[in-house]
Amino acid sequence: MLGTLMIPILVMRARAFPSTRRPLFDKNILRSVPYDLFSLGEFFGFMGMYIPFYYVTSYSISHNIANENISFYLLTLLNVGSIFGRIVPNFFADLTGPLNITFPFILLCSVIAFSWTSVHSLGQMVVFCLFYGCFSGTFVSITGPALATLSNDMSLVGTHMGMSFTFGALGLLVGNPVAGVLLKKGWIAPATFCGTANILAALCILGARVKKAGWNLKVKV
């Protein structure tokens, strides 16, 4: 990855630079309830989102679903599902609005997470990985457009996105280690933690959507 990323780093140039230096922090956006709720949902979402990515291989080996050689490819299946989730729902987000897409997909992600411990065969695990990868991929890819929708000043949209992503990164920082500690009590605990975090994220994002545009589902937001 480092090798391939070095190519655009070396050859890309900015077409135009901003006339003024933009701040790294904008306290005014914190007064926006939809933005605050979405950022909180982002925190919970990233807290639980990547737990299966870290532990699905160990789960498969410990439950004799697949050996070490086969279970290695389950992570690949998660990423294969993520490809579909990052592309197709974003197409519909252009028509309906990113917030209208984010909520149902993160909610479905929590449903799949709660079903994790009911997986007992390789076929079931393949289906789990593809669907979870799809729904989680949508959340990861659509967060940026959703934040742009919630920004109250497009000249500071980069600042607002950076602030929200920084807060969301804290959830990613603590989520997987906490799941590892919970794993000492069995697999139900980290799976429940993953699903609960995703549900909290869905509720916060729903709150952001309602605060932004009300309960009218026809509003593009």
Regions flagged by a language model, labelled:
Residues 10, 107-120:
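C-terminal ends and interior cores of transmembrane alpha-helices
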Residues 151-188, 194:
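A late C-terminal transmembrane helix in Major Facilitator Superfamily
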Residues 1-20, 41, 204-208:
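C-terminal membrane-cytosol helix-exit motif in multi-pass small-molecule transporters
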Residues 138-153:
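Intracellular juxtamembrane helix-capping segments at the cytosolic ends
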Residues 112, 123-132:
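Paired small-residue
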Residues 80-85, 135, 167-171:
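MFS transmembrane alpha-helix packing/gate-lining sites
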Residues 32-99, 103, 144, 175-179:
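Extracytoplasmic gate region of multi-pass secondary transporters
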Residues 66-75, 102, 121, 125, ...:
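Juxtamembrane helix-start elements in MFS-like secondary transporters
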